[in-house]
Amino acid sequence: MHNGVVKAIFKDYLGRAIIIEHEKIESSIGKFISAYAHTNPQADIKVGVRVKEGDIMATLADTSHSKAHILPHLHFSLGRPSESISYEGFVWNTMRNPEKIILADPLPVIDRPYQALEAGNSLCRELWSQKF
């Protein structure tokens, strides 16, 4: 992802979420945020810290004790914040509010190989059949 500043870190039900605000990367895009959820942030990742493209900010949260039986995964969201957004008290409900953030499809900006898994995918079936 692009360089930015950590604006919020908060608990989610599997770990912690990190919100990064990125400055304009092109004049047509403007400011945007990226959210990385279900993580364990590195000790040096705190609100106000500048992060650079390629920095390791966190590891995946251990979900083995989750009552929901969810496999470890990264929840990644991308959006454009409103001009009036406040990061104080930022939680997942903030991400759902279109008056505060307009969500965008993050897949076009991921510059690494990825695979979107569907419930019927053989890898999904194999992973779900294992005890974790």
Predicted regions and their residues:
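Residue-level detector of functional hotspots within protein domains
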Residues: 4-6, 25, 60-64, 92-95
